[in-house]
């Protein structure tokens, strides 16, 4: 009835619907609008009067449009462009009744509908509570409220079978078949496919008379599931609407996202005229019902066919631990073959849409307990031979995105040729490895994940190499002396604060006066015994996880900050650090000089923001605020050092600022192995006087 595949200005007469649905009520205001159509929505606006209907009124409704009533013009801001094909369609009770007459049924008068509504409730009424009303779903209903919400004992006449669409999905018990007026006819309510979503909101209901032999009629009403789910608000049924040209996925109104549990019982949308395992009525003839038929609802749009519901056996549940993957695979293949044969054997008319409920994946929270073989079935559980892979949408994709038909395609929703369990397992493992690699460091774990099929020895060697590279990236580049000699005093001096592996992080150039230094003779250097070069890799644990490496890195940062807070600052501001042209390199042949004779800037307060930033390992200039030689407590100093050497180190930065220009200043590098200073320009060694 609603125009499809074209932009439509759908105008709904709220005044007419209000007065028809709620007797004696007058429309005043609109509280909210719920749109559940599978279409593109552009704008929602209100008009005081109805606009001119430009749809095919003579062909569709049979009665020409009356022009004596006042009309309104759609505002310019809400009008569509002139080059866009569109129609304006008015929807009121008059149009609905004309549509019922056109499709073979007589319109139901308001008096008859009141009689049918009140007949079921008048049985339970007596003289005491004759005028008692209660509120049901926001509307006032005559009669006392039901005894309990789970069992609603409303007796409904067989002449009018009403389907109640509500958020609770409550259903009525089976009503007994009474004798009709003429004995061979009953009035069944059919909801046509309307407004692109099958009219899930039940805005209007079309009543239609269908001739049926009453003797062969078995009426079954839908029941709620026997086992209530954990969360009532999380029930969601997925309905797939199949036609001859395309497929679209729909969800009933009132259901919220979440629980994807498969319910084998029928929902409360349609009147059913079949009995489970008994008889199936179609156009007055009975046919055998297949026990393996999968949840299919056929909605006819003409009076020649009667809607039926074939309730099937319980569908596949992936969350069931008792299911064997091989059995699941066999059952899925059998069901796909059976569905293909059933679709070929059924002669479905052109205007009939079939709703089928496919097997769905388990809830997201339960997939941790599955094996990889069971996880593989989430990717592609069942092949759908009736539609192309382009029109298929997965369930998760439908929940997460919008409900348009064009766009949303994911890996799970794409249907292809049937693959074996081994190939699916391989795909699942690759996807799991890909997800895990994204969570961790890409450079650190890339080789370990690409070599997943190699032996354990190869894996262990790869991980060890990666850990070494990872730890090397945490440390700044160092500058050592050309010789790897170690003096005896360095080995004897206990330094509990600074560890050996942290000394490389402390090596920065320092500017010292030549008068405060004493050159070390070559004989003393030659007398120092040769020591093997220190390799920090030999002293690392063999097996360390990524979290432990990160913990060690954070400990190094914390230790460096503690050293900086302990008084080892060189006394330079951030502006003076920026003015120096010193670069730290791994070679000791660097010829850069330290220009520390610059006067202090006038305004040093504006650089406090730079001083607050922590040093980054990528920028060597950030490491210049840490002084090279470690401060040793006086109780732990060697005997040859004077007690005031610690004080000379602490005030060294202030002395550098007051150095006169005629004094010679040397740029030296501190060597922790030799416990002395090295001049890269002259190649000489110095120690403090």
Swiss-Prot record:
Biased composition, class Acidic residues, residue ranges: 394-405
Ranges of compositional bias, category Polar residues: 251-260, 343-359, 409-421
UniProt-annotated stretches for the region Disordered: 241-263, 333-423, 584-659
InterPro entries in the record: CFA20/CFAP20DC, CFA20_dom
Compositional bias (Low complexity): 584-593
Superkingdom, natural source: Eukaryota
Coiled coil regions, renumbered to chain: none
PANTHER family named among the record's database cross-references: ORF PROTEIN (PTHR12458)
Protein name per its UniProtKB record: Protein CFAP20DC
């Amino acid at each position: 009835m609603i125009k499809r595949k074209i932009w439509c200005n759908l105008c709904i007469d709220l005044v007419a619907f209000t007065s028809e649905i709620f007797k004696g009520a007058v429309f005043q205001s609109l509280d909210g609008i719920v749109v559940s159509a599978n279409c593109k929505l552009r704008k929602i606006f209100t008009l005081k009067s109805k606009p001119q209907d430009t749809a095919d009124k003579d062909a569709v409704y049979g009665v020409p449009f009356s022009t004596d009533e006042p009309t309104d013009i759609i505002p310019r801001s809400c009008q569509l462009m002139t080059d866009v094909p569109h129609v304006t369609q008015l929807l009121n009770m008059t149009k609905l009744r004309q549509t019922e007459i056109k499709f073979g049924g007589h319109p139901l008068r308001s008096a008859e509908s009141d009689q049918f509504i009140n007949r079921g409730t008048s049985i339970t009424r007596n003289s005491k509570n004759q005028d008692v009303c209660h509120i049901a779903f926001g509307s006032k209903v005559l009669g006392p409220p039901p005894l309990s919400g789970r069992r609603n004992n409303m007796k409904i006449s067989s002449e009018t079978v009403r389907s109640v669409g509500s958020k609770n999905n409550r259903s009525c018990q089976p009503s007994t078949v009474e004798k009709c007026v003429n004995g061979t006819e009953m009035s069944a309510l059919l909801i046509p496919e309307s407004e692109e979503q099958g009219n899930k909101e039940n805005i209007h209901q079309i009543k239609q008379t269908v001739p049926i032999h009453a003797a062969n009629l078995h009426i079954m009403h839908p029941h709620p599931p026997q086992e209530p789910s954990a969360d009532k608000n999380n029930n969601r049924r997925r309905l797939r609407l199949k036609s001859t040209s395309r497929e679209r996925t729909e969800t009933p109104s009132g259901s919220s996202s979440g629980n994807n549990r498969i319910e084998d019982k029928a929902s409360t949308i349609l009147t059913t005229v079949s009995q489970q395992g008994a008889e199936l009525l179609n156009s007055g003839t009975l046919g055998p019902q297949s026990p393996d038929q999968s949840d299919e609802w056929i909605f006819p749009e003409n009076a020649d066919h009667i809607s039926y519901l074939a309730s099937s056996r319980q569908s596949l549940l992936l969350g069931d631990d008792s299911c064997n993957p091989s059995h699941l695979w066999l059952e899925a293949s059998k069901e796909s073959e059976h569905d293909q044969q059933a679709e070929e054997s059924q002669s479905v008319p052109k205007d009939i849409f079939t709703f089928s409920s496919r097997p769905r994946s388990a809830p997201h929270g339960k997939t941790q307990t599955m094996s990889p073989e069971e996880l593989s079935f989430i990717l592609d559980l069942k092949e759908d031979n009736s539609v192309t892979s382009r029109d298929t949408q997965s369930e998760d994709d439908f929940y997460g995105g919008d409900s348009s038909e064009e766009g949303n395609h994911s890996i799970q929703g794409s249907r292809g040729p049937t693959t074996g369990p081994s190939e699916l397992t391989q795909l699942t493992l690759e996807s799991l490895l890909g997800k895990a690699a994204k969570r961790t460091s890409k450079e650190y774990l890339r080789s370990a994940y690409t070599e997943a099929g190699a032996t354990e020895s190869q894996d262990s060697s790869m991980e060890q190499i990666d850990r070494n590279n990872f730890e090397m990236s945490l440390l700044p580049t160092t500058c050592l002396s050309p010789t790897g000699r170690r003096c005896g005093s360095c080995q004897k001096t206990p330094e509990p604060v600074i560890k050996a592996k942290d000394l490389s992080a402390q090596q920065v150039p320092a500017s010292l006066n030549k008068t405060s230094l004493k050159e070390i003779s070559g004989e003393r250097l030659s007398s120092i015994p040769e020591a093997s070069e220190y390799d920090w890799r030999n002293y690392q644990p063999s097996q360390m996880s990524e979290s432990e490496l990160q913990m060690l890195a954070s400990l190094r940062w914390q230790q460096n900050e503690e050293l900086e807070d302990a008084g080892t600052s060189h006394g330079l501001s951030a502006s003076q650090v920026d003015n120096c042209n010193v670069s730290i390199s791994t070679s000791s042949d660097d010829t850069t000089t330290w220009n520390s004779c610059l006067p202090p800037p006038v305004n040093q307060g504006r650089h406090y923001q730079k001083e607050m930033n922590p040093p980054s390992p990528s920028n060597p200039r950030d490491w210049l605020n840490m002084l090279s030689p470690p401060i040793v407590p006086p109780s732990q100093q060697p005997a040859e050092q004077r007690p005031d050497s610690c004080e000379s180190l602490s005030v060294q930065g202030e002395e550098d600022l007051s150095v006169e220009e005629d004094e010679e200043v040397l740029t030296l590098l501190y060597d922790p192995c030799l416990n002395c200073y090295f001049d890269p320009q002259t190649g000489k060694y110095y120690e403090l006087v």
